[in-house]
Amino acid sequence: MADIEIKENEIPGVITNCVSDSISSIFKKIFGVVPEYDGDDNSKNIGDGVVGIISFVGDASWILMLAFPKDSAEKLAEKFCGFKVPYDNPDMGDVIGELANVMAGDIVARMGVQGVKVAMSLPTVLRGQNVEPFMAKGIPDKKMHYTVMGKDVMIKIVVGNSNEMMGATPGA
């Protein structure tokens, strides 16, 4: 078992590094380009968009949100599928869920190489305005912003101890 220390307002580097490496690798394979990292900004929201959420438990308990504003979701879904997927179509949820699932599987593998054992949940997909989970005060979180094919993508990571995380059980 790896010793992952959770400090107040700080995401462990092994998590952020694995997430950053994963989005670069997976999006390069799927979309043909490495996402451009635009920095961290916890005050920036996605507006009207769709979000794929995966929880991880094990040596570290945390949540990953892969968020796409409406126009980003439509453009990237079309590239991923090879045909247009309307934003309001239920298939959009399947596309975003699959992207989150593929990325999460890659993250689990990368963390395993680092000696960190985690299991992932099935994806939950939500659509709406500035969709984010409510978490207890003091739980570290981080929003990482990227540009892919000229479109915004946001990743939010929320890390905590197992007893602090809501919905942290895989399959929950």
Feature locations, PLM:
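N-terminal auxiliary interaction/assembly segments of multi-subunit proteins
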Residues: 1-172
